[in-house]
């Protein structure tokens, strides 16, 4: 999650959604009576026909829910403001919030609890180093909360200078990129460019950095204009989502190893996890997204458990359906905890 802006006077937070966990956090902090500003679509009658029209509205929140089988948060409420010509103020509406969307949340007063959850989620976001490369130039940058920092912007030697110059230039870019990776320790690298030179650089990077995930994409130029272009793409959100899924897979692998060697350090099932939480024993909990998908007593119980885990500095990992560990976890009741210490 990125906190794009917080207006203290209006008590308004503008957010960019980057992962399933972000949607879950919003599900927890949105309350009845809050207002949200977001883009949506609605069927509008045009004479004898109707058409789905895109628009930005202000919605007074009634309740929220996860929609089954999609990475989506549904926000139900009453339209407080919308373009006058559509005549839909006061109507019921549902905003579908997806990964990659932006939303403004306005509260009467943000509680310290809700603000802390937002800030904690923003601090969790993975770091990406972006390298735009072409035969004659390259640019390296890293996104931060406050904006994009250009780390390097240089020209490369001309292809006409000598034989083997492409490989030499690729090594030059990869070597400098590796230095920044060591300095900033990003979770992933995005290499983009207009031609095949990016693949040459990727080979060198993979030789130097064995354990960093490298994503490759195309962009029109290795310039600041190209950087602006890539930042508007869905690739950034995909990388964030992939990273969250990879973290879950590693934790599940750890849990399976413990089940085989030290089974007393793992517990699963709602009641068992709840008991472990009450004893302050939970280090990490993994749960499938289905458990937060509907308005029922089980979901409310799970939300209370997760709140207790956070208060006791435990880690929570929400596992989406596209995760490779989803069905494995579902077969273990859908909720599993790795423990800090043995309990009876």
Curated annotation (Swiss-Prot):
* Principal subcellular localization: cytoplasm
User: Which subcellular locations apply to this protein?
Assistant: Cytoplasm
Listed under GO cellular component are: cytoplasm
Q: Which family does it belong to?
A: Belongs to the eukaryotic release factor 1 family. Pelota subfamily.
What InterPro entries does the record tag this protein with? eFR1_2_sf, eRF1_1_Pelota, eRF1_3, Pelota/DOM34_N, Pelota_arc, Ribosomal_eL30-like_sf, Transl-rel_pelota
- Origin superkingdom: Archaea
Q: Does the keyword rRNA-binding apply?
A: no
Cofactor(s) annotated in UniProt:
a divalent metal cation
Q: What is its EC number?
A: 3.1.-.-
Q: What's said on domains? A: The N-terminal domain has the RNA-binding Sm fold. It harbors the endoribonuclease activity.
Which processes are annotated in GO (biological process)? nonfunctional rRNA decay; nuclear-transcribed mRNA catabolic process, no-go decay; nuclear-transcribed mRNA catabolic process, non-stop decay; ribosome disassembly; RNA surveillance
- Describe the subunit structure: Monomer.
Membrane: present as a keyword of the record?
no
Family matches, as PANTHER family:
PELOTA, PROTEIN PELOTA HOMOLOG
- Pfam families in the record, alphabetically? eRF1_1 (PF03463), eRF1_3 (PF03465)
Q: Which organism is it from?
A: Saccharolobus islandicus (strain M.16.27)
Q: What does this protein do?
A: May function in recognizing stalled ribosomes, interact with stem-loop structures in stalled mRNA molecules, and effect endonucleolytic cleavage of the mRNA. May play a role in the release non-functional ribosomes and degradation of damaged mRNAs. Has endoribonuclease activity.
What GO molecular function annotations does the UniProt record carry, in alphabetical order? endonuclease activity; metal ion binding
Q: What is this protein called?
A: Protein pelota homolog
Per UniProt, the keywords (alphabetical) are:
Cytoplasm, Endonuclease, Hydrolase, Metal-binding, Nuclease
